[in-house]
């Protein structure tokens, strides 16, 4: 039987580099690379991508941590020194997305970039970054599901890491990582095979796909705050699914109106 993975990947004297940080930064770098490759298709200067990331990334991390702390306040109110211990894990993707989206809107307006164009080139990278980032939860043994009797369908390294507090746990991190990976692959397929994608289509797909996955997977977790019979993240998931569907509908209606005007 394998030992659990040390959350610290590397120690350099007093400095500890955590796997959690490596996963986040790796996902970020890949997201930046993809966005810069896609930017010229929308007439966006690739240098704007790096400028945006340097501004948005720290704000998104703060937003993700703030969201997590707010919904775990019963713990952090008793352990205030832990609020800033982000290296121990505990950031909420939705908090980061909300903060990042706010910065993106401001940045796009400031640089006269169409918001939907910016979102369309960002969405593929964000999805693959989320897929990679979930493995940080795996190493930290967090964001898992209910106790189960066995996980024999999984490799031993995952089974052992999901053996927490005397029980095997549903590896919700893995389900979400794979869901996002599939979503990323679909986006690439749509871009390659469907040259008629409209502005906002990729963003709509991202919102609907990610929201559906999170809604289902959050229902398997045991560490999320409940509200009105659902987990808070499930309510947020419903909201972004609706947002994606509404965006898709109105873009379709606009396309029909434009077609009628031309004909």
UniProtKB/Swiss-Prot annotation:
Enzyme Commission number(s) from the entry: 2.5.1.145
UniProt GO MF annotations: phosphatidylglycerol-prolipoprotein diacylglyceryl transferase activity
Signal peptide extent: none
BP GO annotations: lipoprotein biosynthetic process
UniProtKB keywords: Cell membrane, Membrane, Transferase, Transmembrane, Transmembrane helix
Protein residues bound to a 1,2-diacyl-sn-glycero-3-phospho-(1'-sn-glycerol): 134
Membrane topology: Multi-pass membrane protein
EC primary class: transferase
Signal among keywords: no
Pathway(s) it belongs to: Protein modification; lipoprotein biosynthesis (diacylglyceryl transfer)
PROSITE patterns assigned: LGT
Any single Gene Ontology cellular-component annotation: plasma membrane
InterPro entries: Lgt
NCBIfam families xrefs: lgt
PANTHER family documented for this protein: PHOSPHATIDYLGLYCEROL--PROLIPOPROTEIN DIACYLGLYCERYL TRANSFERASE, PROLIPOPROTEIN DIACYLGLYCERYL TRANSFERASE
Similarity comment: family membership: Belongs to the Lgt family.
Xref: HAMAP family: Lgt
UniProt protein name: Phosphatidylglycerol--prolipoprotein diacylglyceryl transferase
Protein source organism: Streptococcus thermophilus (strain ATCC BAA-250 / LMG 18311)
Designated gene of the protein: lgt
């Amino acid at each position: 039987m394998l030992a659990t993975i040390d959350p610290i990947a590397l120690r350099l004297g007093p400095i500890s580099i955590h796997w959690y940080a490596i996963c986040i930064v790796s996902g970020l770098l890949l997201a930046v690379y993809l966005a810069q490759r896609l930017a010229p298709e929308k007439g966006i200067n690739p240098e704007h991508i790096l400028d945006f990331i340097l501004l948005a990334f720290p704000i998104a991390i703060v937003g993700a941590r703030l969201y997590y702390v707010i919904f775990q306040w019963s713990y952090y109110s008793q352990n205030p020194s832990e609020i800033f211990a982000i290296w121990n894990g505990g950031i909420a993707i939705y908090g980061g997305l909300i903060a990042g989206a706010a910065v993106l809107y401001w940045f796009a307006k400031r640089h006269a970039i169409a918001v939907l164009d910016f979102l369309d080139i960002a969405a593929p990278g964000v999805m693959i970054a989320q897929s990679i980032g979930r493995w940080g939860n795996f190493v930290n043994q967090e964001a898992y599901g209910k106790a189960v009797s066995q996980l024999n369908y999984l490799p031993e390294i995952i089974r052992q890491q999901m053996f927490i507090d005397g029980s095997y746990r549903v590896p919700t991190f893995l389900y979400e990582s794979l869901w996002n990976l599939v979503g990323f692959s679909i986006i690439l397929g749509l871009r390659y095979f469907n040259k008629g994608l409209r502005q906002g289509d990729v963003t709509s797909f991202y919102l609907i796909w990610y929201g559906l996955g999170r809604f289902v997977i959050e229902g398997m977790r045991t560490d999320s705050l409940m509200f009105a019979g659902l987990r808070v993240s499930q309510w947020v998931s419903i909201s972004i699914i609706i947002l994606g569907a509404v965006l898709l509908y109105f873009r379709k209606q606009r396309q029909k109106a434009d077609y009628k005007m031309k004909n």
